[in-house]
Amino acid sequence: IARNISWETKSDTPTEFGVNIRTPKDFSEVNGYEMKYYKTDKLGLLPKAVLELKNLRNEYKVKMKESESKSEYVKWNNNQLAVKRLMASFYGIVAYQGFGWADVDLAASITASAREAIRIAAFKVREL
């Protein structure tokens, strides 16, 4: 969501939402750059869908916590877990070549931005 990664937001012009798809999978130095950029003017379809699902999941979690019976709790918990899995599957469908809208750049950008976030957090923990 943070990088606005989506089919229609891809940009050949550098923007503030750049992703280095060569971000290492470990703690080694960044060795080279291959940037993919995404437009910042309008929220893309993919992040918009994820945000809507995230809001729906949060609604289900509130209902789950407010449940007055075990069966109601289980129902809302199952609903929020289903939405969680649906959100997580978006990367898989974008990366799957059998999907009509598969896009290697989007899949690479999603995984690279996740690696970058994990690396930043890990480096901060090391500093403690």
Q: Which sequence ranges carry the predicted segments?
A:
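Conserved acidic
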Residues: 1-128
